[in-house]
Amino acid sequence: MNSFTYDYPVRNYFGEGAMDQALDAEMGAMGRTVMLAYGGGSVKRTGVYGHVVDKLTSAGKRVVDFGGIMPNPTYEKCQEGAALAREEQVDFILAVGGGSVFDCCKVVSAQAMLDEDIETFEHADGKMPSSFIPMGCIVTLSGTGAEQNNGAVITNEETHVKGAYLGAMPMWAALDPALTLTVPHAQFMSGAFDTLSHCMESYFGSPRGRNVTDDINLAIQRNVIRNMRIIADDNQNLEALSELVYDSAMAENGVLKIGKSTDFQAHMIQHQYGAYTHTNHGMGLAVIHPALYRHLAPEAPAQFARWAREVWGVDAKGKDDLTVALEGIDRLQTFIGEMGLPTSFAEMGSDASDETLHKVADTCVLTGGCAKKLERSEVFQILTECL
């Protein structure tokens, strides 16, 4: 393992009633003016929005509404939120939803405290914000684990770049699995695959020998797969939903990255594909992973073979590591189809042109943590194999 320092500041409230437990415990630290941030209308239809507003107003808080945060949140939306937070002198940001809402609010929290544009501050000047409006998260859609860290992925619609930002670290997160019962099935499965993707991208980093971080990772992957299969048959199974909500948190709270240099190449490709096509993140990952891994497995056959044996139950007797690895990738792709997720861009309803695929390949970040650093020509080849 690599050397590391691990500091985990997010306070988690998990289980039935976690939302109220968190609000009651944290209300005193929220200040007078609370920005309530959310996505579309689902939080209002389910009653979560009204319940949270009632709790806040009953405690004497002034509520500032910041809704309409879209999937794949835009830089413009983040700037809108930051301007509102400054204008209303917001003391606390309460983000209700999933990864897109949380990512947007992390950037809002930082931008509201900066005198200059955060994109220039971070990307051009290489500086990191140090002052934030404090924030908390209520999870109604799991999968991204975004409530567990300070990373954010934001789309700049002018440049078609889906870029990474560092914003606020949430002070706390409420994870009540019952709040995910109303999530549409396809959307939930997409989020669950994002969790599996986070695990795989951490596992396939380096070092590639056996270590306790990878042991934990492979166990979580098995748990995600087992519970996705349960949800595929019974999407109201609260126990399986609970497992997947916690799996999502574990995948992104840093535990699976301890002592590792991670590989997030699939995410980098999907980020740019999504920036150009506005397609669903988790579904795009489901399409990209098998194609990408068929290119990476020959460079790290032992690592892929272990994953194939321990996660997918591939019988390795009489087979070399690469054969075992490729069989594991085939099982991953079969599983994706069984879960009702797409196995090609065409199944997603996406028909990107060669020109678009070249733009994606030419602009996506190439990571150095995976089995090999891809050339852009190979990224284009992978994308064509996803069609």
Residue ranges of predicted features:
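Short glycine/serine/threonine-rich phosphate/pyrophosphate-binding segments
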Residues: 19-22, 44-48, 75-78, 100-105, ...
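Glycine/serine-rich anion-binding loops at beta->alpha junctions
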Residues: 90-106, 140-146, 276-279
